Amino acid sequence: MSWQDFLARHQVGDVIEGVVTDQVPFGSFVEAEGFTGLAPGQSWPAGTRVSVRILAMDPDRQRFSLAPA
């Protein structure tokens, strides 16, 4: 899936499923549909499957922010 496809399929507020790829001091990175977003303040261990809500999308930088669903 391309980034443009991701943007066409999803909008802020959508709930998606993903897998935590990394935990850092400021949050957890979650891969969903081939793209990685940041869940600030979350401390999920790598490999955990999570349901997350899209909080914000940055089309130019191909980034998105997430929160627990």
Can you say where each PLM-predicted feature lies in the sequence?
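Single-stranded RNA-binding regions, centering on S1/OB-family and related RNA-binding modules
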Residues: 1-69
